[in-house]
Amino acid sequence: MSKISGTLEWAVANANCITGCRHDCVYCFARYNACERFKNVEMGDWPKEKVNWKNAKKRWSKIDGTIMFPTTHDITPNEGELKTLDASIECLKNILKPGNDVLIVSKPHIECITKICKELAVYKDKVLFRFTIGAMDNEILKHWEPNAPSFGERFDCLQHAFKAGFKTSVSSEPMLDSDGVIQMFDMLEPYVTDAIWIGKMNNVRQRVKVQTAADKKYVDMIVKGQTDARIREIYETLKDDPKVRWKESFKTVLGLELAEEAGTDK
């Protein structure tokens, strides 16, 4: 039986409509694949987003299981003639129109989430937001996710979607600050209707280049914060909370049963 990991833990299919991502996250698998592994894009060009309108306008049929959007970019505000938010909303509407269930995953901008909640209100029962929040410390976030929103803005987005009546969840994969993860869980949990996922930063030594003292500091922090012993400590603290979920990277360490079917979101 093939291993169920990554996005397949959450969804059976995915959709994207933008190339590149202005957030330029240091650990990003899509950035690594495009710029390092396959060398399709220069590293300096990755933050220069380009809309794929063919994908945005694609007509979807109904499928069994959840569709995740996006997986290789994020949902970012329009910038002049670069209509990334408009493209994302058009793509989402086309997925939702046939009755599909959609998981929207983002390091969210309040401008984007406010508009998405308004535009997709009629599809509310088919949408689950999953906001990526790996730490509360903005210094840590700024190092790993240099152009993504602050913790405060992401927290505002979570509260906005929750108060607008949408289903909400959080992904703390990668967990960027293991020392603060319990406090963050407790702070976010009241605004989460679904679950808070916690997972390791995968392939950190492979994907992250250590070129400065700051790079070394933060890589060492990640490695120290996701040892087997630390993972077990976090598990023991949170295991009885009904809203906690463990990604495959944690389950492997903990000896928990792995997903056997794509898109079970468990």
Positions of predicted regions on the chain:
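N-terminal [4Fe-4S]-dependent radical SAM core
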Residues: M1-T66, V253
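C-terminal accessory regions of radical SAM enzymes
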Residues: A229-K266
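Short linear functional motifs in flexible/disordered or boundary regions
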Residues: N33, R37-N40, E81, I116, ...
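Conserved AdoMet/S-adenosylmethionine-binding subsite of the radical SAM
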Residues: N52-T237
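Functionally engaged cysteine thiol sites
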Residues: C17, C21, A87, K247
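Short aromatic-enriched loop/helix-cap "lid" or pocket-rim segments at secondary-structure transitions
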Residues: Y27, V208-Q211, E257-A259
